[in-house]
Each structure stands twice: as C-alpha cells, then as structure tokens.
From Swiss-Prot:
It is a lipid-anchor; GPI-anchor. Keywords: Cell membrane, Glycoprotein, GPI-anchor, Lipoprotein, Membrane, Signal, Virulence. A lipid is attached at residue 169 (GPI-anchor amidated glycine). This is Predicted GPI-anchored protein 34. It comes from Candida albicans (strain SC5314 / ATCC MYA-2876). Residues 170-197 form a propeptide. Induction: Induced in biofilms and in oralpharyngeal candidasis. Repressed by alpha pheromone. It is found in: Cell membrane. The gene is PGA34. Residues 1-20 form the signal peptide. Predicted GPI-anchored protein which may have a role during host infection. It comes from the Eukaryota. Its main location: membrane.
Length: 197
C-alpha cells in the first residue's frame, strides 16, 4: 500500500511544477494515473493458482462438452441419414416386390387363359328340333313332315290326295344337299380356334 501511495504523490507533484513554468497557458491540465499492484502471500498465490487451474479445467470441460455435443449431433445426423436410407431401401424393396407380384399375376393370368384355350375342346352343339307344317287341299287329309338335325337327314312325305310342304321337304325334293357330319364340323371349329390363337 505504501508503494502505491508514493507513486501517485510523485506524479501529482510533477504536473503542477510543469504548469507553473508555463505561464502563458490559461488552461490547467490535470492527469491522474493510478497504478495498483497487489502483493499476495505464498498461501494466497497457491490458492489463486488452484482457482486459475480449476477455471481453465472448467473451460476445457465446457469445450469438451461442446465437442461431444457436436459429435453427438453428427452421430444423430448420421443415424438419421442411415435410417432414411434404410427406409428408402425398404420402400424400394416393397415396391419391387409389388411390381414382381403384379407381373406374376399378369403372367399367371395369361398362362391361365392360354391353358384354358389350348386345353378346351370346341364341340358342336347338337340339337334336335322338329317342325311340322301342313297345307290343306282337302279337309280330310293332312300330312306331317319331320326334320331332325341329329343325324343331318331330312324327310319329305307326300300323299296321294294332297301334298304337305315344308322348307326342308322342298329342299330334299329339289336335289342333293351337302351334309356336314359332326367330325367335319368339329375339325372346322378347331381350325378356327387355332387361327384365333
């Protein structure tokens, strides 16, 4: 303390003497300089050193925590990126599987259609029908004409006193009619099916 007081008093003494020599100036300049130096005992010095070391350790700890937080953030970003990539890969895999299943369904559908068409036989429909028609020339005589497509034959019946007519009978009387048998008809239908496939 005494050292600090001596310095301040000596500076103040110098300034007024300089001012006194300069009589031509009307202004007075006063400068105050304070110099403080604190002297510590060895115990206080070691205590301050330990406080300073603790402060530096605390600053280093905060810096370490900040770097760990930055590393953790980078790790989280990396994990999120990997999770996003895994999710995207999973979605792409699911989409590929759906596309594959759809292609399989289309192929199976086409195969089913092809096998159905190739394994089915087209058979002619055999129907039996009969028709009758008569025309009366005399009240007492009637005739019936029966036609059956089962055996692809046609018949005509005529009577002595009158005539019974039908389209099938007229065709049979006019001349020979080409008759398709079941085997020719089936072969024709199979050839038509082969052309369509």
């Amino acid at each position: 303390m005494k050292f600090t007081s001596l310095i301040c008093s000596s500076i103040l003494l110098i300034i007024p003497t300089v001012m006194a020599d300069d009589a031509s100036s009307d202004t007075t300049i006063i400068n105050t300089i304070t110099i403080t130096k604190t002297l510590y005992t060895p115990e206080e010095s070691s205590s301050l050193l330990s406080v300073q070391l603790e402060s530096e350790a605390s600053v280093a700890s905060v810096a370490s925590a900040a770097s760990e937080a930055a590393a953790s953030a980078a790790s989280i970003a990396s994990v999120a990126s990997e999770a996003s990539a895994a999710s995207l890969a999973s979605e792409l895999s699911a989409l590929a599987k759906v596309t594959e299943v759809k292609a399989d369904v289309i192929n199976n559908y086409n195969a089913t259609i092809n096998s159905t068409l190739s394994s089915s036989t087209i058979a002619p429909k055999i129907s039996s029908s009969s028709s009758s028609s008569s025309s009366k020339k005399h009240e007492s005589i009637t005739s019936v004409i029966t036609s059956s497509t089962k055996d692809n034959a046609s018949a005509a019946v005529t009577t002595k006193t009158g005539s019974a007519t039908s389209k099938a009978g007229a065709a049979a009387m006019a001349g020979p009619v080409p008759i398709l048998t079941n085997s020719i008809f089936t072969a024709g239908l199979l050839a038509l099916a082969a052309v369509l496939l």
